[in-house]
Amino acid sequence: MLVFYGFLSSRSISHLKVYLVGGAVRDQLLGLPVKEKDWVVVGATPEEMTARGFKPVGKEFPVFLHPETHEEYALARTERKVAKGYKGFTFYAAPDVSLEEDLKRRDLTINAIAETPEGQLIDPYGGQEDLKNKVLRHVSVAFQEDPVRVLRLARLATKFPDFSIHPDTLELMKKMVCAGEIDALVPERIWQELNRALGNEKPTRFFTVLNQCGALAILFPEIKMEGKGMAALQSVTDKTPSPLIRFATLQSDLPPEIIQKLAGRYRVPNEYADLAILVARFGSDYVNLNRMDETSLLNFLLKTDALRRQERFDQFIFTCDLISSTTSSQPKKIKEIIKAVKSVDIKPLQEKQLKGEAFAKALEKLRLEAIRTLIS
């Protein structure tokens, strides 16, 4: 047995035909850690699963959570395309659906391998051979029916950068793009796959694959393969695993308003959008800090909101330093300036009962004096 920890002892699944499937089997065969396990149940009904204590969670097809492990158990099913888009399917889940039929509906051969409780591998579509040859290949032409598979394959290519895409699979992806299937993708799923890709070993390959099949110009027209942002992402990949930092790096050569438009289109979290816009808008100013006088430095701190949002500003300077690929004293210097500005004593201003514009001008004067003392 490979990863069936405690499998046979569970009363909830005794006498059921249960198989481990998908990424868990694939990663185990590749010697990678298994992060989550998905199971397929053959020959059972929804009523039988609930009677055993499983909690139904699937809206479109029968998926259940194990009462103890909370892992997902799905009844074996087939699917049929009835409309455009990733939701344009009807599903058939019944006791007469075989394991092989269930595996056939999966996207890639390396994800269509099942494992029995005894550790026997069931591989009707050549997944093990493709793992050996490092090939990403579709199970059947039904691959082209689900546009999400284009994103998933592009993301998987970032996780396994030494795997090639089978020519026939790439042709199917191109057909999907030409047929307009990509247009049916929802913003949330596009962002989900992009964010996951940014955290993988070679994130630039996500865009390379999308470009190869023609989807890049449709989904991300702002991003150019030959752009400085792509080159910057490539250069920082081995320096930070953070999807947040990598996202900001990728868009560092774009105008802030373009970044805002992209972020709005795909409902990118504010944390990501804010940092990317900050880097694009003020990155060049940060590089030239040594040339600034006290007035310019204070304006820089206020515009970047460095005095109030220290964590975001730290992410900003970290990103800028990665992009510039230089080791400098800039971070230390700017942090000393921030500390000095924050340490300005405002009690004398309060004692004078200064308010409004008078208070603001007096505070600015004290801050400028604090900065001048440090840089002079």
Curated annotation (Swiss-Prot):
The keyword Cytoplasm does not apply. The gene is cca. GO terms for molecular function: ATP binding; CCA tRNA nucleotidyltransferase activity; CCACCA tRNA nucleotidyltransferase activity; magnesium ion binding; tRNA binding. It is an enzyme of class 2 (transferase). It catalyses: a tRNA precursor + 2 CTP + ATP = a tRNA with a 3' CCA end + 3 diphosphate; a tRNA with a 3' CCA end + 2 CTP + ATP = a tRNA with a 3' CCACCA end + 3 diphosphate. Coiled coil: none annotated. ATP binds at G23, R26, R106, R152, R155. Belongs to the tRNA nucleotidyltransferase/poly(A) polymerase family. Bacterial CCA-adding enzyme type 2 subfamily. It comes from Coxiella burnetii (strain RSA 493 / Nine Mile phase I). This is CCA-adding enzyme. Catalyzes the addition and repair of the essential 3'-terminal CCA sequence in tRNAs without using a nucleic acid template. Adds these three nucleotides in the order of C, C, and A to the tRNA nucleotide-73, using CTP and ATP as substrates and producing inorganic pyrophosphate. tRNA 3'-terminal CCA addition is required both for tRNA processing and repair. Also involved in tRNA surveillance by mediating tandem CCA addition to generate a CCACCA at the 3' terminus of unstable tRNAs. While stable tRNAs receive only 3'-terminal CCA, unstable tRNAs are marked with CCACCA and rapidly degraded. A single active site specifically recognizes both ATP and CTP and is responsible for their addition. CTP binds at G23, R26, R106, R152, R155. Its cofactor is Mg(2+). Keywords: ATP-binding, Magnesium, Metal-binding, Nucleotide-binding, Nucleotidyltransferase, RNA repair, RNA-binding, Transferase, tRNA processing. It holds the Pfam family PolyA_pol. Mg(2+) binds at E36, D38.
